Swiss-Prot record:
PANTHER family: SEC TRANSLOCON ACCESSORY COMPLEX SUBUNIT YAJC
Organism field: Chlamydia muridarum (strain MoPn / Nigg)
Protein name: Sec translocon accessory complex subunit YajC
Keyword Transmembrane: yes
Membrane-topology descriptor: Single-pass membrane protein
Entry annotated with the keyword Transmembrane: yes
């Protein structure tokens, strides 16, 4: 919703000079207007798209560093309980045995209740 409103405002601002320009005056190419629009687009992408994703990624990395034996995790649709933690992998107990997966493949972490 917010992004639609922001896009509408940016579109209107981009069209404003052509709406209110005199018909008789010649249009001259300026660097200012495209530079301002590019700056607004960069700020938009930073605050709306990139920054929240960066925060989410940092929070997940922190949670992965705090993994403990007994935590329940999901990885690529597989749900298991951590049996062993290694440097870059974890060993999961699943219904039919154990599997080893990369820590990077873990998508959700459910802490073990103590």
């Amino acid at each position: 919703m917010f992004s639609r409103v922001l896009f509408s405002i940016l579109f209107f601002l981009g069209c404003c000079p052509s709406l209110f320009a005199d018909v008789d005056s010649p249009q001259r190419a300026t660097f200012g207007q495209p530079a301002v629009m590019l700056g607004i687009a960069i700020v938009f992408f930073y605050f709306i798209l990139w920054r929240p994703e960066q925060k989410r990624r940092q929070a997940m990395e922190k949670r992965k560093s705090e993994l403990a034996v007994g935590d329940k995790v999901t990885a690529m649709g597989i749900v298991g309980t951590i049996a062993e933690i290694r440097e870059h992998t974890v060993v999961l107990n699943i219904a039919s045995g154990k599997i080893e997966i990369l820590k990077a493949a873990i998508s959700e972490i459910f802490k073990a209740e103590k």
